[in-house]
Amino acid sequence: CFWQLEDYLYSNESDRVCLVFGLRRTGKTTMLRQAIARMSREDLSRTVYIKARRSDTMAMMNRDLKKLFDAGFRYVFIDEVTLMRDFIDSAALFSDVFAAMGMKIILSGTDSLGFWLAMDQELYDRAKPIHTTFIPYREYSRLLGIDSIDEYIRYGGTLRAGELAFDDEDVNAQDASFRDDESTRRYIDTAICKNIQHSLACYEAGGHFRHLYSLYEAGELTSAINRIIEDMNHRFLISVLTDDFQSHDLRLTASNLRKERDPEKRTEILDNIDTEAVTQRLMELLDIRNKEEQSIGITDTHIREIKEYLSALELIVNCPIETADPGAKSVEHILFTQPGMRYCQAQALVHSLMKDETFSALSELEKTQTAGRILEEVRGRMLEDIVLLETMKSADREHRVFKLQFAVGEFDMVIYNEKENCCEIFEIKHSGKQVPAQYRHLLDQEKCDKTEQRFGPIRGRYVLYRGEDVTLENGVHYRNVERYLNDLPELNIAPAQEAGIEQTGPVL
């Protein structure tokens, strides 16, 4: 991203602006300051950094930029430009006037949707976009020097952990969250939908809500977006939005604790919890209204439009689920580029559990075990999404990356080489131990036969986990998931046997 910014700064382009946008704490301001710090003394003397405020207008910006141009300034960095309510509808001022006059204009902000809308209208074909929302594990590890997948899950692809002050009204109140420049950066991960609402409210005087206006007017747009984000399957189906809201994390963990193999960890704690009260508490934390409070029905059109805006924010990517049936259509599988939102919701769930009377009456050990198990379940599912997403982004056009489901069971990930007609199959486990149950699907002859029928010979069977690399006698390769993610930029998936070397990982 940084080199793209410098390329723009020192190019001969004279009619385009550079847009640096993404969610909060993804390095936008740091990138701008780094670019300024690397300037020559001469260029620095002609550079200005402006921090926009909510009270600023494009008329004020126009006046100031004229003065700066007359004073000899040619490099203008404007941070948080999307805070100005009339930015989207007047953004062409930057490209058509000041960039055309020879100024290099760099605009940055957290409202990604605002930039997306501006690029479709005012800045169409006149902007060089630089996206910062998605920070892959390898980049996070390089920048912060922390080689821990759990830390990455906690930070969720940003350079800051999720908001934990769930009971702090000053933090959660909308007016407090945006009361100044710094508090704007504190808006809660679980309320990311406010990004959408702010941009749409500013665009064409709020006239572009389309079919979502009824939800927005009734105060239920936040509910609809959050239901999509929380759903464990990440599917945009009407049933997800209209069913009574329940915590999928809580239901799954209760089931797993009942069937825990270790008798010391087996417990029915969650069966005795007042789940209705817990769910109500969680909904309050996430600003979600239940079905009984929902006055506006959710339609397919609502779902499509919400999905479109979440995609524009770069929050979601579709990684389809394939099935063993060659004639069946792939199933939509939405991955979030910011896993921290999911983890933040799980933390909110644990926080609400601690307030439940039944749970509070238990021993500290029981509370710790239960809370830890909930977060372990969440981290496991998030790890699968992270590996799928980053592998898919690293693969070239000759390779497809997807999850493969069968009538019973699934492969967490398949990498299919369309050119060579061969594949590699993976299980992804949030564990540091090697357990036969982890790779049982990889050795299931029926599943493997069905896979090879559709996707050619299986050239490798892998378990990505948090332990050390090792190859078992049965041919299953265990590989450290953190090293796997760090190696992804050099993805060169090809049959290792053809290279005449021993295969210890997906020839990467």
Question: Predicted segments — roles?
Answer:
Residues 196-411:
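Accessory nucleic acid-recognition modules appended to NTPase machines
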Residues 28-29:
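Conserved lysine of the Walker
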Residues 459-508:
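Domain-level recognition of nuclease-like catalytic cores that cleave nucleotide substrates
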Residues 1-9:
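N-terminal pre-Walker A segment at the start of P-loop NTPase domains
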Residues 97-119:
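Sensor-1/coupling segment of RecA-like P-loop NTPase cores
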Residues 391, 411-436, 461:
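Conserved catalytic cores of phosphodiester-cleaving nucleases, focusing on short active-site segments
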Residues 69-91:
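Conserved P-loop NTPase "ATPase switch" module shared by AAA+ and STAND
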Residues 117-268:
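Interdomain motor-coupling "hinge/lid" segment immediately C-terminal to the ATP-binding subdomain
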